[in-house]
């Protein structure tokens, strides 16, 4: 190579050194100084891995003093280059800049600059970059983006709610599905969509203290969302890092008690500028017009400051009208400000629900019914649709569906309230009750008699509570020496049941923590049964460990012994056997116990075992629950109301279980009440709301579409290609499981999302659901998203050279493959990627500017090419540099038309979609006051900003490949 002192060269292998200067040479070696790092390198003159840096007219260069020069002419004097042009800061012309005075920190970012500077990538990296661009663009355009990446079953009603709410601006909704239908998963799906799209960045989740860790684990395991758990200790710690500790994290979980206990803490929470607030178990927030609770007021303060609010709560029927109104008031205090007015409005929705019932029944409608429908909808041109719906034509069903949809839009709370019921959702198991009547031991009989004498002055309620738990009465008299478990027949029955069902998981629930602990000891010592314990005396982490041990298939605990707290919020639907060692005092707690297993996703019928002692309060209560309420084998929404009305009578029978006169009449009366109330609830069911929440056929299609996406083979091929090139080791373990571990030669020292000790992954949803240790890889998983960012945010694969062996073309024929990206810059919350994600436009040009890309598909062409080493590649580039410049000029003239077409289409789509949504909501505002003014204003503002950003859209060259034809 012809070297001269003062020339500027760049290292092919260490481009991070910047521009080097030739400072010494002899017959065999040359020394380069790299001023930006102060390092020297000694190279062999004959075969050094360096490339001469030469700029061309039209380029802009920077001097070591920082000013820039636009090159008009390049001269050579004694082997050194002199650049002549216009200085940009002073606009002075004919300014000269010798190459020795160039800025040494020069970084080549444009693909063509990298190519001409000898920074040539491996061919497979170019292919990976193009695929990454292509797939990323396609994924952004998917209509259900944000719904595919979660580790959950594809359950239509959950997907429907998440799809509807997740796309809204700052959604404020009440999720009030019946127990077991997956409100937590719905909330997680909504969060996932909002965070992925950029609609939200900061999220606060407030839950009961006992559920904090469950939410933390669910958000991470199911949605790959890493929340920070704030308690007193974490809050104090974070005060050292920021004035407002909550600003140290983007995603935060804390307990309701933690939030309301300290005034300054609540102020910090309110000031932390959250985008979304999620409140679980919101029915525990006590409110009345005159005296709202401190908890309610704390959430009210937050809800006033946070744009998006999701409240997870019990069903409106369970809450009662006033409590239901209190939740809606948190979402929109302007709309829900008068309880009496709200009650009146709810009555007025009855005709709407009746109209929907008529349409769904499929019967012909009378003229009166048609007129009523027309009045309810209030559209001028509704007549043809009504006629079609009432005809025998092929489009009759479509017309009925359209009318139902129009009625839904006008329904009072359908935009803010979602409520699915078990009646409207398929997939629930049966519940089978097995009662086991056992004799009352003499030890208990004696203890009960003595207790009756000593506690004669106790209230009936206290005596009733005592009688439900005879082991507690016995233990009180005997003290520490009492060993009730040695003679209680329920213990013998339980051990027999567990030993005869060794392969089955069994959940045992009892009221007291002491009972659970004593049972664990007996089972372990007598029969060697592996039993985990779960009670309120354990820390949250200890409870999580117990639940995880129970969940392990092979080496886990056979039985989980829970105190009553175990029936609040924890789900164990992988088990189907429930033993109630005793009975809870009210039907709500009974339903909570059964609800731990009776959830959507439960694969087996639930076997409910109730061993009870005869002649005790247990024998009274088991009959009342089963015969009076049918509460064991079916959910019982009437339970609380009947319990309240029958309370006094029931308490007396529980306090004196041997006196059964009239008890059969009480059971009969309660059963009649139950049937009547149930019929009343059924009649009052808001079917319109259920249809809206359930999603019907639309939700089924959504689930099916996502299921089809699960089979995307492009993802597997791309992921393996990505892991190979990044340098991540892959070990196929069979059963659709792959173990990924970092290697010593990765593109980056720490690949974001990959733990130091590696992780197990699967591309199969079913495997991910059955193996909690395996991560479910989709296009939305952080490993893939981080991999895409790693490749596309840098210059990996942006310039390369390949050889094409093709005897049909003359040797030395040049082709240049150009990948342009059409894109618009905008804040993430505008979600511009819905309309114009960074979109690759591929061109394959010959020296005459003919674009062969349409005839030559990328993957087919890529397989015909072979790689060139960097040294040979640099020589080739130098030889054909002028020709490549000319082809690049031709590419620049051709890209404009394609890019403009993409931008115009994106503008048209954005305008149609956002204007259409705005017009629809503005029209509905007249008939449905639940459409918020701020939501309309946000859509209008969003539309204007989106269109303005698309007006500013442009394009740039992202990658290029030089192809030279050879016959060898």
UniProtKB/Swiss-Prot annotation:
<dbReference type="GO" id="GO:0005524">
    <property type="term" value="F:ATP binding"/>
</dbReference>
<dbReference type="Pfam" id="PF18339">
    <property type="entry name" value="Tudor_1_RapA"/>
</dbReference>
<feature type="binding site">
    <location>
        <begin position="177"/>
        <end position="184"/>
    </location>
    <ligand>
        <name>ATP</name>
    </ligand>
</feature>
<dbReference type="Pfam" id="PF00176">
    <property type="entry name" value="SNF2-rel_dom"/>
</dbReference>
<dbReference type="Pfam" id="PF00271">
    <property type="entry name" value="Helicase_C"/>
</dbReference>
<keyword id="KW-0805">Transcription regulation</keyword>
<dbReference type="GO" id="GO:0004386">
    <property type="term" value="F:helicase activity"/>
</dbReference>
<dbReference type="InterPro" id="IPR022737">
    <property type="entry name" value="RapA_C"/>
</dbReference>
<dbReference type="InterPro" id="IPR001650">
    <property type="entry name" value="Helicase_C-like"/>
</dbReference>
<keyword id="KW-0010">Activator</keyword>
<dbReference type="InterPro" id="IPR040766">
    <property type="entry name" value="Tudor_2_RapA"/>
</dbReference>
<comment type="similarity">
    <text>Belongs to the SNF2/RAD54 helicase family. RapA subfamily.</text>
</comment>
<keyword id="KW-0378">Hydrolase</keyword>
<dbReference type="InterPro" id="IPR000330">
    <property type="entry name" value="SNF2_N"/>
</dbReference>
<feature type="domain" description="Helicase C-terminal">
    <location>
        <begin position="490"/>
        <end position="685"/>
    </location>
</feature>
<feature type="domain" description="Helicase ATP-binding">
    <location>
        <begin position="164"/>
        <end position="334"/>
    </location>
</feature>
<keyword id="KW-0238">DNA-binding</keyword>
<feature type="short sequence motif" description="DEAH box">
    <location>
        <begin position="280"/>
        <end position="283"/>
    </location>
</feature>
<comment type="function">
    <text>Transcription regulator that activates transcription by stimulating RNA polymerase (RNAP) recycling in case of stress conditions such as supercoiled DNA or high salt concentrations. Probably acts by releasing the RNAP, when it is trapped or immobilized on tightly supercoiled DNA. Does not activate transcription on linear DNA. Probably not involved in DNA repair.</text>
</comment>
<dbReference type="Pfam" id="PF12137">
    <property type="entry name" value="RapA_C"/>
</dbReference>
<dbReference type="InterPro" id="IPR027417">
    <property type="entry name" value="P-loop_NTPase"/>
</dbReference>
<dbReference type="GO" id="GO:0003677">
    <property type="term" value="F:DNA binding"/>
</dbReference>
<comment type="subunit">
    <text>Interacts with the RNAP. Has a higher affinity for the core RNAP than for the holoenzyme. Its ATPase activity is stimulated by binding to RNAP.</text>
</comment>
<dbReference type="GO" id="GO:0016817">
    <property type="term" value="F:hydrolase activity, acting on acid anhydrides"/>
</dbReference>
<keyword id="KW-0804">Transcription</keyword>
<dbReference type="InterPro" id="IPR038718">
    <property type="entry name" value="SNF2-like_sf"/>
</dbReference>
<dbReference type="GO" id="GO:0006355">
    <property type="term" value="P:regulation of DNA-templated transcription"/>
</dbReference>
<dbReference type="Pfam" id="PF18337">
    <property type="entry name" value="Tudor_RapA"/>
</dbReference>
<dbReference type="InterPro" id="IPR049730">
    <property type="entry name" value="SNF2/RAD54-like_C"/>
</dbReference>
<dbReference type="InterPro" id="IPR040765">
    <property type="entry name" value="Tudor_1_RapA"/>
</dbReference>
<keyword id="KW-0547">Nucleotide-binding</keyword>
<keyword id="KW-0067">ATP-binding</keyword>
<dbReference type="InterPro" id="IPR023949">
    <property type="entry name" value="Helicase_RapA"/>
</dbReference>
<dbReference type="InterPro" id="IPR014001">
    <property type="entry name" value="Helicase_ATP-bd"/>
</dbReference>
<keyword id="KW-0347">Helicase</keyword>
<protein>
    <recommendedName>
        <fullName>RNA polymerase-associated protein RapA</fullName>
        <ecNumber>3.6.4.-</ecNumber>
    </recommendedName>
</protein>
């Amino acid at each position: 190579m012809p070297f001269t002192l003062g020339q500027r060269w760049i290292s092919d292998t260490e481009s991070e050194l910047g521009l080097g200067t030739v400072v010494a040479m002899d017959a065999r070696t040359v020394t380069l100084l790299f001023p930006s790092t102060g390092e020297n390198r000694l190279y062999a003159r004959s075969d050094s891995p360096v490339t001469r840096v030469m700029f061309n007219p039209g380029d802009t260069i920077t001097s070591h003093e920082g000013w820039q020069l636009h090159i008009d002419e390049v001269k050579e004097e004694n082997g050194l280059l002199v650049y002549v042009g216009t200085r940009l800061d002073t606009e002075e012309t004919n300014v000269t800049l010798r190459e020795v005075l160039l800025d040494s920190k020069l970084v080549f970012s444009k693909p063509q600059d990298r190519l001409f500077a000898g920074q040539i990538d491996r061919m497979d990296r170019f292919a990976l970059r193009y695929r990454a661009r292509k797939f990323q663009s396609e994924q952004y355009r998917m209509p259900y983006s944000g719904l595919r990446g979660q580790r959950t079953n594809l359950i239509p009603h959950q997907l429907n709610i998440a799809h509807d709410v997740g796309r809204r601006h700052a959604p404020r909704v009440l999720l009030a599905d019946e127990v077991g239908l997956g409100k937590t998963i719905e909330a997680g799906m909504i969060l996932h969509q909002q965070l992925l799209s950029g609609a939200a960045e900061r999220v606060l989740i407030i839950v009961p203290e006992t559920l904090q860790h469950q939410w933390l684990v669910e958000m991470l395991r199911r949605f790959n969302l890493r929340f920070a758990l704030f308690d007193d200790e974490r809050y104090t710690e974070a005060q050292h890092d920021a004035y407002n500790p909550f600003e140290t994290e983007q995603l935060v979980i804390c307990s309701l008690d933690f939030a309301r206990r300290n005034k300054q803490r609540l102020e910090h929470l309110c000031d932390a500028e959250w985008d979304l607030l999620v409140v679980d178990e919101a029915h525990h927030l006590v409110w009345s017009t005159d005296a709202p609770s401190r908890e309610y007021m704390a959430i009210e303060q937050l809800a006033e400051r946070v744009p998006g609010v999701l409240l997870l709560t019990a069903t409106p029927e369970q809450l009662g009208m006033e409590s239901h109104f209190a939740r809606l008031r948190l979402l929109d205090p302007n709309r829900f400000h008068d309880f009496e007015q709200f009650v009146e409005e709810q009555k007025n929705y009855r005709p709407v629900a009746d109209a929907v019932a008529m349409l769904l029944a499929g019967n012909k409608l009378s003229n009166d019914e048609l007129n009523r429908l027309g009045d309810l909808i209030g559209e001028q041109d509704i007549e043809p649709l009504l006629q079609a719906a009432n005809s025998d034509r092929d489009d009759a069903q479509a017309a009925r569906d359209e009318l139902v949809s129009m009625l839904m839009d006008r329904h009072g709370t359908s935009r803010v309230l979602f409520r699915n019921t078990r009646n409207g959702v398929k997939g629930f198991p049966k519940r089978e009750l097995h009662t086991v009547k056992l004799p009352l031991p003499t030890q208990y009989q004696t203890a009960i008699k003595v207790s009756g004498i000593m506690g004669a002055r106790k209230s009936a309620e206290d005596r009733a509570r005592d009688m439900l738990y005879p082991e507690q009465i016995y233990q009180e008299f005997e003290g520490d020496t009492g060993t009730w478990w040695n003679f209680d027949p329920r213990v013998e029955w339980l051990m027999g049941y567990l030993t005869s069902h060794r392969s089955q998981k069994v959940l045992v629930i009892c009221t007291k923590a002491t009972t659970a602990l004593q049972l664990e000891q007996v089972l372990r010592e007598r029969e060697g049964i592996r039993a985990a314990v779960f009670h309120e005396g354990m820390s949250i982490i200890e409870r999580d460990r117990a639940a995880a041990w129970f969940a392990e298939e092979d080496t886990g605990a056979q039985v989980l012994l829970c105190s009553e707290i175990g029936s609040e919020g924890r789900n164990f639907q992988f088990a189907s056997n429930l033993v109630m060692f005793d009975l809870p005092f009210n039907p709500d707690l009974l339903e909570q116990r059964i609800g731990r297993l009776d959830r959507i996703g439960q694969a087996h019928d639930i076997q409910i075992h109730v061993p009870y002692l005869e002649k005790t309060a247990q024998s009274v209560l088991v009959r009342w629950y089963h015969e009076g309420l049918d509460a064991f084998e079916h959910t019982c929404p009437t339970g609380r109301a009947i319990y309240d009305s029958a309370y006094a009578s029931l308490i007396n029978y529980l306090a004196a279980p041997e006196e059964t006169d009239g008890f059969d009449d009480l059971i009969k009366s309660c059963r009649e009440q139950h049937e009547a109330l149930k019929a009343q609830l059924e009649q009052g069911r808001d079917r319109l709301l259920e249809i809206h929440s359930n999603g019907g056929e639309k939700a089924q299609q959504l689930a099916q579409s996502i299921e089809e996406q699960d089979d995307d083979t492009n993802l597997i091929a791309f992921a393996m290609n990505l892991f190979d090139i990044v340098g991540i080791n892959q070990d196929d373990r069979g059963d659709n499981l792959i173990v990924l571990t970092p290697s010593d030669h990765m593109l980056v020292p720490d690949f974001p999302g990959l733990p130091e000790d590696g992780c197990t992954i699967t591309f199969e949803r079913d495997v991910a659901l059955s193996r909690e240790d395996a991560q479910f890889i989709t296009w939305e998983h952080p490993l893939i998203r981080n991999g895409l960012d790693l490749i596309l945010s840098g210059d990996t694969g942006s310039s390369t050279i390949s050889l094409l062996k093709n005897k049909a073309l003359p040797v030395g024929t040049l082709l240049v493959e150009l990948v342009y990206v059409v894109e618009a810059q905008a804040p993430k919350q505008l979600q511009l990627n819905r309309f114009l994600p960074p979109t690759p436009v591929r061109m394959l040009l010959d020296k005459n500017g003919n674009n062969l890309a349409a005839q030559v598909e990328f993957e087919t062409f890529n397989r015909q090419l072979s790689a060139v080493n960097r040294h040979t590649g640099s020589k080739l580039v130098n030889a054909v540099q002028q020709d490549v410049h000319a082809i690049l000029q031709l590419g620049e003239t051709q890209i404009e038309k394609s890019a403009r077409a993409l931008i115009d289409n994106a503008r048209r789509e954005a305008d149609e979609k956002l204007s259409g949504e705005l017009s629809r909501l503005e029209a509905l505002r007249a008939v449905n006051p639940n459409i918020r003014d701020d939501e309309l204003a946000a859509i209008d503002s969003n539309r204007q900003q989106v269109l303005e950003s698309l007006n500013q859209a442009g394009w740039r060259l992202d990658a290029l490949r030089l192809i030279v034809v050879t016959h060898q």
